[in-house]
A protein has these predicted regions:
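An N-terminally biased module of ancient metal coordination in phosphate/nucleic-acid-related enzymes
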Residues: 1-97, 101, 108-110, 132-133, ...
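Short, functional N-terminal and low-complexity linear motifs
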Residues: 100-104, 160-162
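Caspase-like (clan CD) cysteine peptidase catalytic core
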Residues: 128-129
Length: 282
């Protein structure tokens, strides 16, 4: 095993509107632009941590391809290749000398309007449950659980709830998560400083939205962390560092331009209205 710097995007979706090869190439390009300090090891490896919604299983598709089968969704790779590791929760994708570890994880939409990312697991969780129940259930897994930022999600009632959750569930496996969708004019939310005082750290990632143009930002927000890498068990190697409060993180970020932020928010509202209209007519 060797000590390396892991360059990580901790909130990734492989949406159906994306071309998988483009996502991986963009991620490789963006992660390679991160500039760790001289205190971190020179050798770098790249990670994408998936946070898949209830009905999605892109990781399962990638693993099926790695095992020589077909993806249920029809997902295909053209220039990138995928192979298994010794872990059911991690595959490695490669294009020539470039490779990225892709780690399974889930995104749980909770009843209160907050979300929990459960990283490094293939276990499924139902949406719509109270967030306290989700945090209690996932605590036993010993993997990172992240409450991600979202526009307006940490204000008022939900902001007060978040304050309570930070007090109740503060452990090395609980994190907050900054997102690449935060616009340049939106300052770093105060809850991150509050969490840091309680030992709840920021585990940032891009959280690309389900629009084809958003694939370009995968890998633009994340962090660098020293890892004792076992190439056969790369997920366990990374997660061991993440839940160790004595291991430092160095975040990097490219925030959303204001016009792109407004465009995406309008697009998400229109998407939600179409979905609600379809459900009402069904």
């Amino acid at each position: 095993m060797s000590i390396v710097t892991a360059v990580v995007d901790a909130h990734v979706h492989l949406h159906a509107c994306y071309r998988p090869d483009e996502l991986l190439s963009r991620a490789r390009q963006n992660l390679a632009q991160a500039r760790p300090s001289s205190d971190l090891p020179t050798l770098r490896v790249f990670y994408l941590l998936l946070a898949e919604c209830q009905n999605d299983d892109s990781f399962g598709d990638l693993r099926a391809l790695a095992l020589g089968g077909r993806a249920r969704s029809g997902l295909k790779l053209q220039t990138w290749m995928v192979r298994t590791t010794d872990e059911d929760r991690c595959v490695v994708v490669a294009d020539g000398s470039a490779h990225i570890y892709v780690v399974a994880g889930r995104q749980v939409a909770c009843r209160e309007g907050l979300e929990v990312l459960v990283l490094g697991t293939t276990q499924r969780f139902e949406d719509g449950r109270p967030i306290r129940d989700v945090l209690e259930e996932t605590e036993a897994l010993g993997v990172p659980r992240v409450i991600p930022w979202g526009p307006g999600k940490w204000f008022f009632r939900r902001g007060r709830l978040l304050d309570s959750l930070l007090e109740e569930f503060r452990k090395p496996t609980l994190f907050l998560g900054d997102e690449g969708g935060r616009p340049e004019f939106w300052s770093y939310p105060a809850h991150f400083a509050r969490g840091a005082r309680l030992g709840v750290r920021d585990l940032p990632g891009t959280d690309p939205l389900p629009f084809s143009h958003d694939v370009a930002k995968v890998g633009r927000m994340g962090f660098c962390v020293p890892v004792e890498l076992d190439p056969l068990r790369p997920a366990a190697s990374l997660l061991r560092s993440l839940v160790n409060p004595n291991v430092p993180f160095e975040r990097f970020a490219s925030l959303e331009p204001p016009l792109r932020f407004v465009r995406n928010q309008i697009g998400m509202q229109l998407r939600k209205r179409r979905r609600d209209s379809h459900q009402a007519s069904a």
